[in-house]
């Protein structure tokens, strides 16, 4: 059996789009009862995906806006990004576009492993962003797209499978061996 791989994933988006709900559904299989703004939480989960075992570290960030400064801890050592907007909020999609540009600029990259996620698909009667709009943006960014309902746990696992797929697409060759330390003589 192949050794376990570590993946560090950062979940980003504006306030109240459901980042914590998606993360908690995936990690703990439950939805928070009430909304409490997140400062920052880190979660761990061991999963098996496509025959490989992964230790997934998930950073659930505080809600951002277009004026937020991208914190260094959200760019250093991160393998992939889950960029979440609410299908009920046009402004949350605009924030995601700005965040995407900030991440690319911070990393000096044209493309990064990421998944665009339209959350709150259960609120279809309040929808302001069509599924096609999400797909179109994901196609422009050349990344995966998933619509989900964190509240109802619909497609939540798919979000995390897709980010692992995106990270693995960007991986070249085997991971470097773990350093064991050195001895100076």
UniProtKB/Swiss-Prot annotation:
Gene Ontology BP, a term: negative regulation of phagocytosis
Residue ranges annotated as propeptide in the record: 183-185
Instruction: Detail which positions bind Mg(2+).
Output: 20, 38
Q: Which Pfam families match?
A: Ras
| PROSITE patterns xref list | RAS
Q: Which UniProt keywords apply?
A: Cell membrane, GTP-binding, Hydrolase, Lipoprotein, Magnesium, Membrane, Metal-binding, Methylation, Nucleotide-binding, Prenylation
This protein's record includes keyword Membrane: yes
Location(s), subcellular: Cell membrane
Known catalytic reactions: GTP + H2O = GDP + phosphate + H(+)
Q: Which residues does the record list as Cysteine methyl ester (modified residue)?
A: 182
Q: Name one GO molecular function term.
A: GTP binding
What is the membrane topology noted in the UniProt record heading this document? Answer: Lipid-anchor
Task: Enumerate the NCBIfam families for this protein.
Answer: small_GTP
* Family affiliation: Belongs to the small GTPase superfamily. Rheb family.
Query: What is the documented function of this protein?
Result: Binds GTP and exhibits intrinsic GTPase activity.
Q: Please report the name of this protein according to its UniProt entry.
A: GTP-binding protein Rheb homolog
